[in-house]
Amino acid sequence: MKNMKLKSILMTMFVLVLLFSFSVQGAEVTAEQPIVVTTCGQSPGALMVHQLCGQVGLNSEKKDLLEADYLKENDFKTVIITMGTSGKGMGAAGTDMQEEAERINGVIEEAKKQGMTIIGAHIEGEARRVDKNDEKSIKTVAPESDIIIVRKDSNKDNYFTDLGEEKGIPVHVIDKTLQLTEPLSEIFQVSK
């Protein structure tokens, strides 16, 4: 009898852990489609976000070198900007971190003018928090975001959760990149 009760309790706890494998800090903020996804640092995170948007049925366009003018010409409601850099990616794109920061500052300024929701996403883990370029990418995007999504190992120092608390930005913490579908579904109010 005791074994059955213990098994039942353990099973319930296991299900709850699975259901809540990501946590949210801050007030709930929702966003609308269509979505444009870009990167501040030319890492492959934008491609991952774009693909995971598709998995939950979200209408997104990936534009690695997104400029403010493109926002003026299109009717996007949300911009998702991935944080973290790739030296190879920036080299292939013919850019550097200073140019990336200037480009993204322009995108953020235009997005705010249009009343778009800005989502900052650091979903590639601590490997994208190793140098000054990564730091510049993060500090360009995170404080200006309306919502932050961060992978747990990217937040070991609690930078993102502390920033969210300080600025009133909701922060969604996920354990693994593939779990990005959970906060995306919640933020865009879609059922998977």
For every predicted segment, state its role:
Residues K2-T12:
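Bacterial N-terminal signal peptides that target proteins for export
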Residues M11-S21:
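Bacterial N-terminal signal peptides
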Residues F22-G26:
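Sec/Tat signal peptide C-region and signal peptidase I cleavage site
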Residues A27-V29, V36-T38, V150-K192:
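Charged, low-complexity C-terminal accessory regions
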Residues T30-V56:
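Short, charged N-terminal beta->alpha structural module
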Residues G54-N74:
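A short, well-structured beta->alpha microelement
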Residues G91-G115, L163-H172:
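A short, gly/pro- and small-residue-rich
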Residues R129-D162:
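Structural recognition of alpha->loop->beta junctions
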